[in-house]
Every structure is written in C-alpha cells, then in structure tokens.
Amino acid sequence: MFKKVLVANRGEIACRVIRACKELGIQTVAIYNEIESTARHVKMADEAYMIGVNPLDTYLNAERIVDLALEVGAEAIHPGYGFLAENEHFARLCEEKGITFIGPHWKVIELMGDKARSKEVMKRAGVPTVPGSDGILKDVEEAKRIAKEIGYPVLLKASAGGGGRGIRICRNEEELVRNYENAYNEAVKAFGRGDLLLEKYIENPKHIEFQVLGDKYGNVIHLGERDCSIQRRNQKLVEIAPSLLLTPEQREYYGSLVVKAAKEIGYYSAGTMEFIADEKGNLYFIEMNTRIQVEHPVTEMITGVDIVKWQIRIAAGERLRYSQEDIRFNGYSIECRINAEDPKKGFAPSIGTIERYYVPGGFGIRVEHASSKGYEITPYYDSLIAKLIVWAPLWEVAVDRMRSALETYEISGVKTTIPLLINIMKDKDFRDGKFTTRYLEEHPHVFDYAEHRDKEDFVAFISAVIASYHGL
C-alpha cells in the first residue's frame, strides 16, 4: 500500500479522497492556490502546498503537480473528477516520472475519451449503440445522408465532448444544416477540435449508467446502475441507485455486457459506462467516464462497496476481493446536488459568501461537502456546494427522507437549488418514477416556490421597521 498520496483536486471530492486515504493509513498531500489557503481540503490533509496564484490553472498544471509529488515523496496521485482526471497526457506523465496514477492506464483514457473510437470498441464487444455515423462526420452532406437513412430527430455531438457542450438536437434537415456549424464551432472552442458524430435521437430518454470496478489482473465486476435523468443544461442534478426502470433480469444482462466490454479494453480502476434508455428499458451506449463520478456515493450506499478506497487499493496492486456474486443491491439511494445557483434565473451561478450553514443528519443521511459558514463561492470553479445523499429500504421512504433532509438543510448568503429539489421530491411524477431527461422542461411547476427568508433576517427587518417608525 502507498505511504503518501497527493490529491490533485479541491472541494468535496478532495475531502472524500483524503478521508479514504486516512482510513487506509495513507498520508495525504493537498494542493491549493492563494484564494484557497483556508479551504477544508487544505486543513484535512497532512501536508498542503500552494502551487499557484491564478485559481484558473492551479489544478491544471500537470507538470508542477507531478514535480511536487516527487519533491514530497508521494508515490501516487489521485486526480478526483474534473480538471486532469481524464487527461491522458497527465496520466502518461505520471507513468513517465514513476508516479502511480490512481485511475486506468493512459491508453485506455485516450481510447474512451474519443467518442467515435469508443463507440466502435463497444460495438465489437456486443454493447448496443445508438444508430448513427460509424465515425467522424466528413461534412454536413454526409450528416444529411445518414439522417435521412435513420430518420429524424437526430443528435449532433462533439466526438471529444463532455458536460453537454457541442450537442444539438435536429428535428429536420433545415435544423441539421443550421446546427452543424454551431456545434462544430462550439466543439472547437471547448475541446480544440470540431469532430462531430451523428446519432438517432431517442425521444423521452432516461440517462442510465453502470458502475464498473476492475483490478490489474483482469478481474472486473459491476456495481449496478444509476438513473441520472434529472438534469439541467445536460448536467446532472439528481441521481438514483438503482434505477426504477430496469428489471433484475435487465440489470444482470446489461451488467454482464459492461463487464465483458471493460475486460476487452483492459480496464482497471473505477469507471462508468453511460447509456441512453428508451421507454422499454433498452439501453444504448453513449460514453465511458474513466474516473470517479460525482454521484458514486449512491452506489456505495446500496452495495456497501467503498469505491474510492478500491480505486486506491487497485492502483497499489491489490486484487479485487469481490466476485460478481458477492454484490447485493440493498434498498434505494438518492443524491441531490446542492449548487450555488438560482434555478429561477436559468440556473445562473450565485456568487457570494455563505452566511449561515447547517447540515442535516440522522439515520440514512450522508453529506459530502467542503463548505461551512464563511465559505466563499467564487466564479472560478463549479457551483457545487455539497452532495446530499440518503438511503432507505424502500423508494418511497428514500424520497421522503430526502425531502425532509432538504427542508432541514440551511444555507444563506447565496441562492441554491434546495427549494427546487424539495419541489421535485414532492412531485407525483417523480415519486412514481415517471421522469426523463426532459423532466424540468415538462414540469415547470417545480420552479414555483417562495424565496426563503432566514429567521434572523426577518427579525432584523422587523426591528428596522419598528426603529424607523419610532425615529430611533
């Protein structure tokens, strides 16, 4: 096992990795910049080093991070998610410098990061894929020809995409021609190249993903699926495990396919295969994420498997201690992302200082966060404040527990997604499992909530009115 690990990330995921390392008896090294010198992950780590002043490139400075690991005697680097987590050049640099990258081999990251190549690999492994182009589109004329063959609507998306960028839905040829150039330009701006794919667009889809875990000796298991259909701007907001869509037979069938595919590409570490699902539960491969997912806790809650610890164990050369038969799915887990955003203003970021912060607790409730009173929400990073996770033996109980926990969670100073999430938990369609990736568009009433006023603010307001009235 490693003696020291450098965590090349920030926020809640850095705290999560540091906690896992501590439980394994591993010393931890945090990195930070000038504006995050008092951040929670910095305080939690055994050692912490400021490696930059500019908050925009601190966690993207691959060479400086690897050099620091060598300087302080860290044998491995955990990249978390985002930043350099799926950067094959960073993983390769670690290998070249003799540092263990806690994740899959850089060649696999490179392969699965290319949507066109990854789709070809999945096809060969027998995993269903969405009908569409076999590779990168040559031009808009080829896109028009394929769209005519498979029928509208179709989806244009960037081959190197992620985070919902470079994606366009086209319902006819006119929209396809117009969106082709827009998608191309967006892809160039976001990913450095404009390679586009075209696929059949599945109406009323669900977003289903399978968690896999493999070691360096060819052993691979799956930990079931998650439903991540409730999204804003193609980014996840609520995640559920297991899904309400798949039957046990479908779970076993698709689980065996993802395990087979992972073995064929030589995958080790934690990974997630993402699918789009139609109303009958047919799954079609979209992409593979070669890192820990934001939503991994819901899978941990229903399986009892600590995914982050196993990432570290596998990187250190340990064999998996589980067979597929050992994995049992117990109850239901829901995760809500608490973001510093204003849902009523198109989820615009809410910048400011957290003035009041109270976290819920109790049986079946888990909070992953790096926030506290006085925590500064800046424009430099993702708006995630915390992840609220609940578990219960029954779906209805899990939903009620999440609603209650959300109502108990107190954050002031910035707008958050909490009021919206409370309304989602109360919504009959959500409770009945009748939701797709279009849920928020089709349920505008969940945005209808009163702005919360803190008791202290209200008392101060009344006091000011009284003082003004009496001329005080």
From Swiss-Prot:
<feature type="domain" description="Biotin carboxylation">
    <location>
        <begin position="1"/>
        <end position="445"/>
    </location>
</feature>
<feature type="binding site">
    <location>
        <position position="115"/>
    </location>
    <ligand>
        <name>ATP</name>
    </ligand>
</feature>
<dbReference type="GO" id="GO:0046872">
    <property type="term" value="F:metal ion binding"/>
</dbReference>
<dbReference type="GO" id="GO:0005524">
    <property type="term" value="F:ATP binding"/>
</dbReference>
<dbReference type="InterPro" id="IPR004549">
    <property type="entry name" value="Acetyl_CoA_COase_biotin_COase"/>
</dbReference>
<dbReference type="InterPro" id="IPR011761">
    <property type="entry name" value="ATP-grasp"/>
</dbReference>
<dbReference type="InterPro" id="IPR016185">
    <property type="entry name" value="PreATP-grasp_dom_sf"/>
</dbReference>
<keyword id="KW-0460">Magnesium</keyword>
<dbReference type="InterPro" id="IPR011764">
    <property type="entry name" value="Biotin_carboxylation_dom"/>
</dbReference>
<dbReference type="GO" id="GO:0034029">
    <property type="term" value="F:2-oxoglutarate carboxylase activity"/>
</dbReference>
<dbReference type="Pfam" id="PF00289">
    <property type="entry name" value="Biotin_carb_N"/>
</dbReference>
<keyword id="KW-0092">Biotin</keyword>
<comment type="subunit">
    <text>Heterohexadecamer of 8 large subunits and 8 small subunits.</text>
</comment>
<dbReference type="InterPro" id="IPR051602">
    <property type="entry name" value="ACC_Biotin_Carboxylase"/>
</dbReference>
<dbReference type="InterPro" id="IPR005481">
    <property type="entry name" value="BC-like_N"/>
</dbReference>
<dbReference type="InterPro" id="IPR005479">
    <property type="entry name" value="CbamoylP_synth_lsu-like_ATP-bd"/>
</dbReference>
<dbReference type="Pfam" id="PF02786">
    <property type="entry name" value="CPSase_L_D2"/>
</dbReference>
<feature type="binding site">
    <location>
        <position position="199"/>
    </location>
    <ligand>
        <name>ATP</name>
    </ligand>
</feature>
<keyword id="KW-0436">Ligase</keyword>
<dbReference type="Pfam" id="PF02785">
    <property type="entry name" value="Biotin_carb_C"/>
</dbReference>
<keyword id="KW-0067">ATP-binding</keyword>
<feature type="domain" description="ATP-grasp">
    <location>
        <begin position="119"/>
        <end position="316"/>
    </location>
</feature>
<protein>
    <recommendedName>
        <fullName>2-oxoglutarate carboxylase small subunit</fullName>
        <ecNumber>6.4.1.7</ecNumber>
    </recommendedName>
</protein>
<dbReference type="InterPro" id="IPR005482">
    <property type="entry name" value="Biotin_COase_C"/>
</dbReference>
<keyword id="KW-0547">Nucleotide-binding</keyword>
<dbReference type="InterPro" id="IPR011054">
    <property type="entry name" value="Rudment_hybrid_motif"/>
</dbReference>
<feature type="active site">
    <location>
        <position position="291"/>
    </location>
</feature>
